[in-house]
């Protein structure tokens, strides 16, 4: 792989200038993750909340929903949009959204949540792990639904998490099958030796993912090395180290990387180091392939859960829901430049 990087340097520069020919495409779906709590609680989002979607509010009440989104990037934006669309379908004009973005700052999440609590909102959507943690700390009475977080047990420090948080919290998780992601990496890069695990140490969900996939990758014969950065300020230097010492880099569903994919792309592409991503937004920005969920659909599932809660269902008994299907996706121009042969069951991402 190291020798290949030099040979590919010229070809890869074309990726920076524009898109090359596609590698071929078709669709595939993968079953929900079979790790941790998801074994017992994974449900189809098509079935989840379907009854709520067919019910229309007739009591005339206007529901006020506070939305705390950690940061602005494609995945979280899509989850918020799906959530709002699902609730609007049920309640029409009788639901109002106070959508606020914390710009990646956990302390700002807490400030936003405190505002929702002061307003006595009817329900809070916490989009991403830091937002969920702030909401859990901010109120034990207002219903909280999380989304775009990976593992609620890790995020909320719950021992022996069984899939149901209890109290005033439930939601959806974006956990992809990490064993499937490892298998996908091996399918595309069977001759690679060293895998760099690039992630933000401040994001509990990212740490969980790299720890988990490391075990799967090592079983496939790879040597793995952690490359943790504390925030966007040291992403460039850490990513450079990873690119210098890795054959392939893996990035989980990391919010900091998702908001700074250009940094990763501008380092890894000239270095000739392909990036396998945990979700499609990161993949579009800097990756070659991903096994990803639809964040819009995840948001819709969360919105259907919210409708049930607002119509009287007990949130304390509602298990965390997971995406039922996952799609192998690839970026055609980068795969072409790297000379990657993409199997027919991958779907080309729009560039």
Task: Write out the residue ranges for each language-model feature.
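Hinge/cleft segment of the Venus flytrap/periplasmic-binding protein
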Residues: 308-351
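Extracytoplasmic "Venus flytrap"
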Residues: 53-92, 98-109, 202, 206, ...
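Sec-dependent N-terminal signal peptides of Gram-positive bacterial secreted proteins and lipoproteins
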Residues: 3-26
């Amino acid at each position: 792989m190291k020798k290949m990087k030099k040979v590919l340097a010229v070809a890869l520069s074309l990726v920076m200038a524009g898109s090359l020919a596609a590698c071929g495409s078709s669709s595939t779906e993968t079953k929900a993750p079979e790790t941790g709590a998801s074994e017992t609680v994974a449900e189809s989002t098509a079935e989840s909340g379907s009854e709520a979607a067919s019910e229309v509010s007739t009591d005339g009440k206007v529901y006020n929903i506070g939305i705390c989104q950690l940061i602005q990037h494609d995945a979280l934006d899509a989850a918020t949009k799906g959530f709002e669309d699902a609730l609007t379908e049920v309640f029409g004009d009788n639901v109002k959204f106070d959508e606020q973005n914390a710009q990646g700052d956990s302390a700002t999440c807490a400030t936003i949540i405190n505002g929702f609590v002061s307003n006595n909102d009817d329900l809070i959507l916490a989009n991403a792990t830091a937002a969920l943690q702030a909401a859990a700390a901010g109120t034990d009475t207002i219903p909280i639904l999380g989304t775009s977080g990976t593992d609620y047990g890790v995020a909320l420090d719950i021992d022996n998490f069984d899939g149901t948080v209890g109290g005033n919290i439930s939601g959806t998780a974006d956990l992809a099958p990490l064993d499937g992601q490892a298998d996908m990496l091996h399918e595309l890069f069977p001759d690679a030796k060293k895998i760099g695990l690039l992630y933000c140490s401040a994001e509990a969900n990212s740490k969980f993912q790299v720890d988990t996939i490391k075990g799967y990758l090592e079983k496939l014969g790879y040597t793995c090395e952690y490359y943790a950065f504390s925030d966007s300020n040291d992403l460039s230097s850490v990513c450079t180290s990873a690119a210098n010492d890795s054959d392939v880099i893996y990035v989980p569903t990391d919010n900091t990387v998702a908001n700074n994919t250009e940094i990763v792309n501008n380092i890894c592409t000239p270095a000739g180091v392909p990036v396998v991503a945990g979700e499609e937004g990161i993949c579009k920005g800097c990756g070659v392939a991903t096994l990803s969920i639809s964040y819009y659909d995840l948001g819709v599932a969360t919105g259907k859960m919210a409708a049930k809660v607002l119509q009287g269902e007990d949130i304390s008994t509602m298990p965390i829901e997971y995406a039922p299907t996952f799609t192998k996706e690839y970026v055609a121009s980068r795969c072409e430049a790297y000379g990657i042969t993409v199997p027919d069951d991958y779907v080309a991402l729009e560039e």
